[in-house]
Amino acid sequence: MKKILFLLFVLFSVKTNAQSITLILNDPDKQSPTNVRVKPGGEVVTTIDSRAELATVHVIAKEGNYFLVNSYSTCSSDEMQLKQPGYIHYSVLGIFISNYANIAMPVYASSNKSGPLEKLKISDVFVNVLDYKNDMYYVFYKKLNKKFWVESKYLCNAACTTCN
């Protein structure tokens, strides 16, 4: 029984680590730091201050509209581990579309690249990340009020530099 539990733990750990991503913390509220919660919608356990400069967070899981993060860094600091992992709402997390070739890039209705395909010509814009899987990101682009899946090759998660 212990071996089975250990194997399940190892399999779950591998899956979780394989799905980890880095997102940019871009909180529009510049009056106070961003809340990190013990559970989605729960008590605030710590804050991350990204008012002076953007920060990146290391995401290890997703639950509903929240991402579970375990560390963060800013342009002027190395990675800092949180005392305990905590949840941040998707509305303050995202990524840049870095379509520097300025081509009409394909976007999809699902992460398996099936469903209606559309081509959008957008570049150097911040989008909120709603989900991620199969090297695809489900994003919300506020300016167009559109949600779509996009391949990671069109995205940049660098808060302090540009991506090529």
Report the location of each language-model feature.
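Sec-dependent N-terminal signal peptides
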Residues: I4-S13
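Sec/Tat signal peptide C-region and signal peptidase I cleavage site
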Residues: V14-A18
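SH3/SH3-like beta-barrel superfamily modules
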Residues: T46-P85, K121-K153
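Short N-terminal segments immediately surrounding and downstream of signal-peptide cleavage
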Residues: Q19-R37
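Boundary regions of SH3-family modules and the immediately adjacent low-complexity/disordered segments
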Residues: S20-L23, L68-M105, S111, F140-N164
